[in-house]
From Swiss-Prot:
InterPro entries assigned: Cystine-knot_cytokine, TGF-b_C, TGF-b_propeptide, TGF-beta-rel, TGFb_CS
Keyword Protein biosynthesis: no
Family: Belongs to the TGF-beta family.
Name this protein carries in UniProt: Protein decapentaplegic
Role summary: Acts as an extracellular morphogen to establish at least two cellular response thresholds within the dorsal half of the drosophila embryo. Required for the proper development of the embryonic dorsal hypoderm, for viability of larvae and for cell viability of the epithelial cells in the imaginal disks. Acts together with scw.
Species this protein is from: Drosophila pseudoobscura pseudoobscura
Region (Disordered): 80-188, 470-512
Length: 616
């Protein structure tokens, strides 16, 4: 009977009715009663016991009433969509000062007919699952019993709304409730206004936090690529850029135009290939060619010349004496000759001679002369100037190298007096002519051209073009090293600060922005020079780029002046600029190519690649 009276009292009031989605749960009845309770004062122990007993009896009566015929079944089984629309309409009507408070429930009734009772019960059970985290938070808050119950009622009602509508109405509902000054407010609205903790929770819940907000971002390492990857993935420059690159390289190579040659008709001597490999730092097992030009440490160019056949050669019919002629006009006049050597290849002796024990023990003497004056038949003998002599054995030496620098110097000074060289082979015991052909000047009839190219006599001229600069004190002493950590592969301690054990540079989080060496690969095929440049096909020039932060660490390979400049810039940026990231040490690149006269040239170009970077 008390339950019927309670429901009639609710219908008689002019305030909005808080709708309950289901009456089969006794906790919902308790929330319903607590929501419409007119008082908020803390009840005494006796009052609390009486209220609990009354609530239990009321809940039992309400449950029994819901199972029987009830004219308010449609109202009690309204869907969550109608509840959300009802609340939204109530808020809008209140902001517009609309006193028609019964319009919302009437509209909700029409919308509620679209949903079945089974769907409403299923959705109601899914929404009202126990929330352990909310109950634990509510226990820690020192609030009144009524406020706790009302807060749960508000949350249950808000959970009826779909997720998208709930996110859209979070902020408008909060603003409307906080700014509303009307006197007609339901108990739920009053609780919503007076509970700041609930409003704070709604604002926090409305913030969208990315899923990876707490993830740790690992430090990215600088990208490194192999030379094959750089060649494969590099961008082709436009034609105008190619012309500029070609002009710059021609100026660097001291050429007016690229040589036009037929590469198929030229064979690179094996001696030049070995010399190139040795200069590039490769270890070779059998290299017994003296290189006097390299001992000067200033020759940066090596040229090879082959023997030019002439009718004069017929005047030397004997196998132990022969004439060699080399055309050295292709050597520029501005280059200074540092050394010159003659390389002779000895043919294998006959099997009978090799098998002879005495022949294996026999030593031979090779002599080379500069023909300073030709002879006239019947009038005068030719004049010779002994240049060098070498002693060789049959079973030990395959090549013979002789120093002929005085003769080449005379040829460069007076080209018209280049009469060639005279080579003579004798035995050491009797100083008689050697009985076997040790050196050949012409290709045999049954010998391939390529085989003869590797065996023919060669003249090597070592010159210096004077374009390279003298090494500084820092480079010679090793203090100008490769830039340490700033140079990526540089050698030496760097910065002139020689230390026995230099500590490893500190790793920066954004180390790509600091001064360091970057890759810059130059491919000769891009400018169409791969037809006359034998080796290498390209090279990595590198470049320096990055910031010089304050304070300058040791691995930045900085000078004392750069340290002072950085300090002054940090104190007064407008007075002096920051230190710049520049190359601190450069290295040379050896190139093997062909010139216009089809001469094989091995040139060591100075300051072509960056070894270390630093702040200067």
């Amino acid at each position: 009977m008390r339950a019927w009276i309670l429901l009639l009292a609710v219908l008689a009031t002019s305030q909005p009715i808080v709708q309950v989605a289901s009456t089969e749960d006794t906790s919902i009845s308790q929330r319903f009663i607590a929501a419409i309770a007119p008082t908020r004062t803390e009840p005494s122990a006796a009052s609390a016991a009486a209220a609990a007993a009354t609530a239990t009896a009321t809940a039992t009566a309400t449950t029994a009433l819901a199972k029987a015929f009830n004219p308010f079944n449609e109202l009690l089984y309204k869907s969550s969509d109608s509840d959300s629309d009802n609340n939204n309409n109530n808020y809008k009507n209140r902001n517009n000062n609309n006193n028609n408070l019964n319009k919302g429930p009437r509209n909700n009734k029409n919308k509620g007919n679209k949903h079945s009772k089974s769907d409403a019960n299923r959705q109601f059970n899914e929404v009202h699952k126990p929330r352990t985290d909310q109950l634990e938070n509510s226990k820690n808050k020192p609030k009144q019993l009524v406020n706790k119950t009302n807060k749960m009622a508000v949350k249950d009602q808000k959970h009826h709304q779909p997720q998208q509508q709930q996110q859209q109405h979070h902020k408008p509902a909060t603003t409307t409730a906080l700014t509303s000054t009307e006197s007609h407010q339901s108990p739920i609205e009053t609780i919503f206004v007076d509970d700041p903790a609930l409003a704070l929770e709604e604002e926090v819940a409305s913030i969208n936090v990315p899923a990876n907000a707490g993830a740790i971002i690992e430090e990215q390492e600088p990208s490194t690529y192999s030379k094959k990857e750089l060649i494969k993935d590099k961008l082709k420059p436009d034609p105008s850029t190619l012309v500029e690159i070609e002009n710059s390289l021609l100026s660097l190579f001291n050429m007016k135009r690229p040589p036009k040659i037929d590469r198929s008709k030229i064979i690179i001597p094996e001696a030049m290939k070995k010399l190139y490999a040795e200069i590039m730092g490769h270890e070779l097992d059998s290299v017994n060619i003296p290189r006097p030009g390299l001992l000067t440490k200033s020759a940066n160019t090596v040229r090879s010349f082959t023997h030019k056949d002439s009718k004069i050669d017929d005047r030397f019919p004997h196998h132990h004496r022969f004439r060699l002629h080399f055309d050295v006009k292709s050597i520029p006049a501005e280059e200074k000759l540092k050394a010159a050597e003659l390389q002779l290849t000895r043919d294998a002796l006959a099997q009978a001679a090799v098998a002879s024990t005495s022949a294996n023990r026999t030593r031979y003497q090779v002599l080379v002369y500069d023909i300073t004056r030709v002879g006239v038949r019947g009038q005068r003998e030719p004049s010779y100037l002994l240049l060098d002599t070498k002693t060789v054995r049959l079973n030990s030496t395959d090549t013979v190298s002789l120093d002929v620098q005085p003769a080449v110097d005379r040829w460069l000074a007076t080209p018209q007096k280049n009469y060639g060289l005279l080579v003579e082979v004798r035995t050491m015991r009797s100083l008689k002519p050697a009985p076997h052909h040790h050196v050949r000047l012409r290709r045999s009839a049954d010998e391939a051209h390529e085989q003869w190219q590797h065996k023919q006599p060669l003249l090597f001229a070592y010159t210096d073009d004077g374009r390279h600069k003298a090494r500084s004190i820092r480079d010679v002493s090793g203090g100008g090293g490769g830039g340490g950590g700033a140079g990526e592969g540089g050698k030496g301690n760097g910065g002139g600060r020689n230390r026995r054990h230099q500590r490893r540079p500190a790793r920066r989080k954004n180390h790509e922005e600091t001064c360091r060496r970057h890759s810059l690969y130059v491919d000769f095929a891009d400018v169409g020079w791969d037809d006359w440049i034998v080796a290498p096909p390209g090279y990595d020039a590198y470049y320096c780029h990055g910031k010089c932060p304050f304070p300058l660490a040791d691995h930045f390979n900085s000078t004392n002046h750069a340290v002072v400049q950085t300090l002054v810039n940090n104190l007064n940026p407008g007075k002096v600029p920051k230190a710049c990231c520049v190359p601190t040490q450069l290295d040379s690149v050896a190139m093997l190519y062909l010139n216009d006269q089809s001469t094989v040239v091995l040139k060591n170009y100075q300051e072509m690649t960056v070894v270390g970077c630093g702040c200067r």
